[in-house]
Amino acid sequence: MGCMKIFLASKSPRRRELLENLNFPFQIVENDIEEVSSEKEPSKYVMDLAFKKALKAAENIKEEAIVIAADTIVVVDGEILGKPKDREEAFSMLKTLQGREHIVYTGIAVIKLPEMKHSVDYQETKVWIRRLEDEDISNYIDTGECWDKAGAYAIQGFGSLIVEKIEGDYFNVVGLPVAKLFDLLKREFGVKWVGRGFEYKDKRLAL
């Protein structure tokens, strides 16, 4: 049985941890792109950015492999919130989100090399942040969790103290809708879940 390599085009420790928890073998590959898209519809926006990340990462891979990328945003009243640039922006984002519903979108993209077969999909989850005093927002920012997070919060950390409820896929809010991803990998690319491991057709997935 031969081997197939999987590359994750993401620097997110949350996405890495989610895949590691599944015993899914992968390597990290850089995908430095400007995270901007001309798409206005949130679902198309995240799928476009996820595909751009996967495409950029694929440029440096010269072997048979599968490349996975993802992009997550928060949308409230039609406005897209990305990652805060500074404390003031983080405070503004959390102030906007508190006491109301917003939607988390994550786009996923998969490219099979060398033939460049690709597929994209997305997941959305509704999230309600409880009402927060300014002191609560400042305390949360002081935890340091808001950086590098769409919408300036992390649901799996201290952010669990400010989230009132969710409707939909929890892991999507963390940053990677794993059920949606593995459905795509199986349906479009032949990656199978076998016991406590995974296979690609007649090949073993390996680092």
UniProtKB/Swiss-Prot annotation:
Gene3D superfamilies xref list? 3.90.950.10
Name the cofactor(s) required for activity, per the record: a divalent metal cation
GO terms for cellular component: cytoplasm
Could you list this entry's UniProt keywords, alphabetically sorted.
Cytoplasm, Hydrolase, Nucleotide metabolism
Q: What enzyme category does the UniProt record give? A: hydrolase
In short, the EC number is 3.6.1.9
Report the SUPFAM superfamilies cross-referenced here.
ITPase-like
**Keyword match RNA-binding:** no
Q: Per the UniProt entry, what are the Gene Ontology biological process annotations, in alphabetical order?
A: nucleotide metabolic process
- One Gene Ontology MF term: UTP diphosphatase activity
The primary site where this protein sits is: cytoplasm
Location of the active site: D71
| Reaction(s) catalysed by this chain's protein | dTTP + H2O = dTMP + diphosphate + H(+); UTP + H2O = UMP + diphosphate + H(+)
Indicate where this protein resides in the cell: Cytoplasm
Site feature (Important for substrate specificity) residues: R14, T72, Q156
NCBIfam families reported in the protein's UniProt record? maf
UniProt lists the family membership as follows: Belongs to the Maf family. YhdE subfamily.
Q: What does this protein do?
A: Nucleoside triphosphate pyrophosphatase that hydrolyzes dTTP and UTP. May have a dual role in cell division arrest and in preventing the incorporation of modified nucleotides into cellular nucleic acids.
Protein name according to UniProt = dTTP/UTP pyrophosphatase
